[in-house]
């Protein structure tokens, strides 16, 4: 992968950026297999026995893991900033996510409690790892190239999802004939593949990605960490009046993620319930959508730096709206595949744009803290979005079309909020805030913003 020097900060080697992007490659298999293509539908239809409350229960489990993340992430964000422990925290989160993914191989019909525990642990660890890895972005990317580098990470991540899904598709297609695997065995096999790919692909991350932060002399210890992190979170929130455009971005990200989280966690459930998809169909669908997503994330990374992050994000939000309309009205497989590929284009590009915009609108010296705040908002969205979908299916007698249509309201609301965001003014707010509190970053070239 080629990384132009102009897109990187001084002293950052291309292989370090490759190591950073390798983590996106590694962990994408978890979301595609566990949350999107395989295990979510397996939980609803097998573990929970396709009960009327099964979809709602799945969304509750996802909500619980997100709620825990909202509580612990401020602690982890403060720890990462104060003790310069982003890299160590990233390693621990990786190990926990892989171990819990392997734990899911022990689930089956009726094992609701164990499955719920493993999902909560793995999803929590995944989100923590995603947050800590994102916090490295301002350290390795130049201000002019942050969109490109973020896009590289997302596109490389979708390539990782393709590798994991491709191997999983081969297993479920040929496994029954070659090794006599039944349905449960095929699902377990995809989980083993996911964990192994995750472990192997993170080797470049921990070999090459550097911790550039310096521990603060007055860094809090474990006993005082929670109270200090709560104070830090309060301080972050209290800074929002001075960083109003970061606040608007956070609200936009929350509304966008409400819809995105539904697509991630319930797409296979929707495809199975409404379109009659099999396990092979679902994996193939997500596999091809990941190709679209990789192209979208990579291409939009360059589009962002050409037309600006805000316009890029606005474009992807309208693509999400179009996807919802097509999916909710799909009567045939072709129409549904069109909706799925629209989701793929929007998925990587909207998340890449949001991550890049945080780097522009937040104080660089407190990057992990503000990324933690940003991700806390996204985790809250991971509660609200899926729970809304699950509640609608429950009260409407499993009307998944109605549930996906209501999901579209989140994207429309995000568009309304995004219209009020000004990137130039927001950038000035961030730099003025750094100067006011005495945390000025090293001199950089002027940033061209929309």
Place the predicted regions along the sequence by residue:
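Structural signature of the two symmetry-related core transmembrane helices
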Residues: 88-103, 311-326
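Multi-pass alpha-helical transporter architecture, strongest
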Residues: 2, 197-208, 405-443, 448-449
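Helix-to-loop junctions at the C-terminal end of transmembrane segments
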Residues: 71-85, 295-309, 393
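Juxtamembrane intracellular "pre-TM" segments in multi-pass secondary transporters
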Residues: 2-17, 210-251, 436-450
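Glycine-rich segments within core transmembrane alpha-helices of 12-TM secondary carriers
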Residues: 151-172, 375-386
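Hydrophobic core of transmembrane alpha-helices in multi-pass small-molecule transporters
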Residues: 100, 111-129, 335-349
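Short amphipathic helix-loop junctions that connect adjacent transmembrane helices
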Residues: 32-55, 265-282
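A membrane-interface helix-boundary motif in multi-pass transporters
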Residues: 51-53, 172-196, 391-411
């Amino acid at each position: 992968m080629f990384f132009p020097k102009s897109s990187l900060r001084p002293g950052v080697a291309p292989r370090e950026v490759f190591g950073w992007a390798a983590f996106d490659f590694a962990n994408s298999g978890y979301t595609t297999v566990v949350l999107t293509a395989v295990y979510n539908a397996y939980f609803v239809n097998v573990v929970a026995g396709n009960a009327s409350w099964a979809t709602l229960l799945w969304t509750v489990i996802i909500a619980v893991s997100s709620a825990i993340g909202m509580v612990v992430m401020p602690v982890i964000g403060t720890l990462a900033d104060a003790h310069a422990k982003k890299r160590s925290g990233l390693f621990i989160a990786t190990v926990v996510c892989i171990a819990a993914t392997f734990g899911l191989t022990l689930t089956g019909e009726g094992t609701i409690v164990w499955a719920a525990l493993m999902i909560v642990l793995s999803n929590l660890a995944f989100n923590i790892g995603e947050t800590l890895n994102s916090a490295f972005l301002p350290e390795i990317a130049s201000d002019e190239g942050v969109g490109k580098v973020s896009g590289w990470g997302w596109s490389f991540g979708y390539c990782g999802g393709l590798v994991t899904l491709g191997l999983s598709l081969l297993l479920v297609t040929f496994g029954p004939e070659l090794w006599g695997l039944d349905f449960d065995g095929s699902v377990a096999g995809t989980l083993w593949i996911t964990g192994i790919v995750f472990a192997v692909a993170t080797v470049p991350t921990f070999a090459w990605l550097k911790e550039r932060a310096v521990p603060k002399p007055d860094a809090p210890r474990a006993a005082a960490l929670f109270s200090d992190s709560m104070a830090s979170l309060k301080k972050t929130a209290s800074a929002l009046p001075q960083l109003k455009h970061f606040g608007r971005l956070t609200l936009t990200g929350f509304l966008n993620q409400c819809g995105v989280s539904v697509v991630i966690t319930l797409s296979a459930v929707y495809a199975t319930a409404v379109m009659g998809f099999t396990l092979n169909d679902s994996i193939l669908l997500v596999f091809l959508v990941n190709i679209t997503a990789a192209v979208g994330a990579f291409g939009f990374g360059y589009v962002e730096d050409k037309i600006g992050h805000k316009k890029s994000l606005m474009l992807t939000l309208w693509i999400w709206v179009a996807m919802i309309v097509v999916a909710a009205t799909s009567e045939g497989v072709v129409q549904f595949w069109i909706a799925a590929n629209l989701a793929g284009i929007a998925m990587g590009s909207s998340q890449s744009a949001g991550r890049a915009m945080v780097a522009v609108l937040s104080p660089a010296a407190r990057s992990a803290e503000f990324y933690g705040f940003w991700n806390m908002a996204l985790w809250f969205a991971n509660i609200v979005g899926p729970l809304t979908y699950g509640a609608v299916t429950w009260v409407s007698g499993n009307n998944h079309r109605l549930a996906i249509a209501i999901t579209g309201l989140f994207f429309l609301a995000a568009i309304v909020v995004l219209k009020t965001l000004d990137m130039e003014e927001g950038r000035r707010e961030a730099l003025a805030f750094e100067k006011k509190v005495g945390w000025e970053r090293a001199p950089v070239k002027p940033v061209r913003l929309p």
